[in-house]
Structures are given as structure tokens and as C-alpha cells.
Amino acid sequence: MTIAIGQEEGRGWFDLVDDWLKRDRFVFIGWSGLLLFPTSYLSIGGWFTGTTFVTSWYTHGLASSYLEGCNFFTAAVSTPANSMGHSLLLLWGPEAQGDFTRWCQIGGLWAFCALHGAFGLIGFCLRQFEIARLVGIRPYNAIAFSGPIAIFVSVFLMYPLGQASWFFAPSLGVAAIFRFLLFIQGFHNFTLNPFHMMGVAGILGAALLCAIHGATVQNTIFEDGDAANTFRAFTPTQSEETYSMVTANRFWSQVFGVAFSNKRWLHFFMLFVPLAGLWTSAIGIVGLALNLRAYDFVSQELRAAEDPEFETFYTKNLLLNEGIRSWMAAQDQPHENFIFPEEVLPRGNAL
């Protein structure tokens, strides 16, 4: 038996904090939690406050709260007024000057929720990195979550930064998001954008892959117990595989002629397809922020400028977008005071 005599090595405050943050508890905190929990709490709390009490009369000329009679679908935390530009709208800034009521009236809650929400999503991504490191697994969950972060940052932050003000970002509400979709189509023709096409292919393709994968696994689960359902027969510590990859491979080989034979490649493909869709959509939105739009595959305006004999022509797509713009603009951008004479508005039977 050996007895070591000596003074215990002193532990610094960083080690003590590290131990406390990573302690095994019902809800893991971690270093990422220092960013995740405060920002998420403030963002979600700000959204509930705004949708319950705060009007959009001074920014959009709209009612947008439960207090004004809105429901879950029509309530929103609306974007700041166009005149605010790209100001951070700090409560103590020159616009509100510490007046909370005035801060809410000019749209300060939207900037508050959007910025804290972005940092909350980043904190959640870092949380997945941190827990993956502690558990000893690869960090692909965190990498996959970069997709939603890219979408949020591009739509709520980068798009309005490329436009005139925060006003043109989506307001934080259900109907408000659909309004933004119509706006993006009418003013940018986003459905004809190849980045949007890649995004649609990625998201719908991922949904198809998810359905096929789930059904195939359920179809090929081994009968490893006599319980009434398959869930009770499964044990999380079993050494053998739960379903037959060989049988699944044989099935899809017969159906399509080709099939995945490697689980790693199969699941990486299921990670790659939706993530590629999310990222390409985000890149497309950044393009819209810079007004890199294409109203048609070949711009009629450019051709008309080069060829004096070329006559521009309407397509149903152009007419539809023109209708969206003229229908939305007057109410959607009240600060512009648009007034359209009846003779220039698209007629209802023009399609």
C-alpha cells in the first residue's frame, strides 16, 4: 500500500464552472446553454408579448395583436417602419430613447425577437456539437441543423439588409409568413429561380426518402419477441440489428433494379438531400436581397433594348406577378402612398 503525501492541486474557477455546467441533470446546460437559454427565452417571450399586446398601426397600419381582436393566424410581431432603415432599434437608442411604449410602437420587438432568435438557433446548434462531443458521437446532427440556421438568417436578416429596411423582412406570424411568400413571388418571381427549384427538390425529395426509409425499416424488422407490438420486443442494448438490410436491399432491387447496399451511404444521402435543399434556398434568398431576379429566362427588357423590332409579350406568369404587385403594394407599403388608377390594374378575367 502506497500513501502519497502532498497538497491537492488547486482548481481554477474555469474548471469549477465547467464541472457545474456539464453536470448530469434532467436538462443539460453546458457552455452552449449560456447562449441558448437566455436568447431563446427572450425571443419567445418577446413574441408572446408582441402578439398579445402590441399593435402594428404605427408601422404597417394594421392590427396585429390578440388585444385588437386578432387570432393565432393573424397575430404577429410586425417589422419596424420603413423609416427606421436598418437600425438595431435598441431600447436605449436614439429612436425610442428608453421609452418602452414608443419602442414597441416603432417595431423594436421585431428586431429584438429576430436577433435573439438567430443567436438562439446558433446556441441550439452548438448544444448539439457539445453533447455529441461529451457522448462520443459524430457531430452530424449539428451540421444538419446548419440548414435551418441558414434559412432563418438569410430570410429574416440578410434579405432585409439587402433591401431598403427591416420593413421588408417577414413579420413574425402565420399570415405574415404567407404574405411574405406572395411578396417574394410577386416582386422577385422566386418560383422561376433555380435556387428555389433546388430547394423544392431537396425538401420534397427528403420527405419522400423519409417515408420510404421508415416504411422499409418497419417492413423488415426482425420478429425478435412475442409481444403484441414491435416496440416492446425491441431492446436498446441488443447486439444484433433490428431490421434486415439484406431483405430491404433485395426488395428495392426488385422494385427499381438498384438499391442502397450500404447503411452509411443511405443515411448520409438522407442527410445530404434536405440539407442541400435548405442551403440552396438560403443562397437564393441572398440573391433576392441583392435583387438578382429573373422575370423570365431571357429578359425581354434587355432584348427590347438591343432589338428595335422586338415586341415584348405577356406570359401568364408575368401577368400573375403584376397582379400580385398591384394588389399588394398599396396596402403592403402604406408609407409609399401608392394610388393606382383603375385602368392600369389587371382585370379579373385577364388570365
Swiss-Prot record:
A GO CC term assigned to this protein in UniProt: photosystem II
Please tell me where Fe cation binds in this chain: H213, H267
Q: Which reaction does it catalyse?
A: 2 a plastoquinone + 4 hnu + 2 H2O = 2 a plastoquinol + O2
Q: Where does chlorophyll a PD2 bind?
A: H196
Q: Where are the transmembrane segments?
A: 39-59, 123-139, 151-164, 206-226, 277-293
| Record Gene3D superfamilies | Photosystem II protein D1-like
Q: According to the record, how does the cofactor bind?
A: The D1/D2 heterodimer binds P680, chlorophylls that are the primary electron donor of PSII, and subsequent electron acceptors. It shares a non-heme iron and each subunit binds pheophytin, quinone, additional chlorophylls, carotenoids and lipids. There is also a Cl(-1) ion associated with D1 and D2, which is required for oxygen evolution. The PSII complex binds additional chlorophylls, carotenoids and specific lipids.
The topology of this chain with respect to the membrane is: Multi-pass membrane protein
Positions annotated to bind chlorophyll a ChlzD2:
H116
Q: Which domain of life is it from?
A: Eukaryota
Name a Pfam family for this protein: Photo_RC
Q: Does the keyword RNA-binding apply?
A: no
Q: Where does pheophytin a bind?
A: Q128, N141
Would the keyword Membrane turn up in this protein's UniProt record? yes
Could you list this entry's UniProt keywords, alphabetically sorted: Chlorophyll, Chloroplast, Chromophore, Electron transport, Iron, Magnesium, Membrane, Metal-binding, Oxidoreductase, Photosynthesis, Photosystem II, Plastid, Thylakoid, Transmembrane, Transmembrane helix, Transport
Report a single Gene Ontology molecular function. Answer: iron ion binding
Misc remark: 2 of the reaction center chlorophylls (ChlD1 and ChlD2) are entirely coordinated by water.
Q: What does this protein do?
A: Photosystem II (PSII) is a light-driven water:plastoquinone oxidoreductase that uses light energy to abstract electrons from H(2)O, generating O(2) and a proton gradient subsequently used for ATP formation. It consists of a core antenna complex that captures photons, and an electron transfer chain that converts photonic excitation into a charge separation. The D1/D2 (PsbA/PsbD) reaction center heterodimer binds P680, the primary electron donor of PSII as well as several subsequent electron acceptors. D2 is needed for assembly of a stable PSII complex.
Instruction: Please report the name of this protein according to its UniProt entry.
Output: Photosystem II D2 protein
Query: Native species of this protein?
Result: Guillardia theta
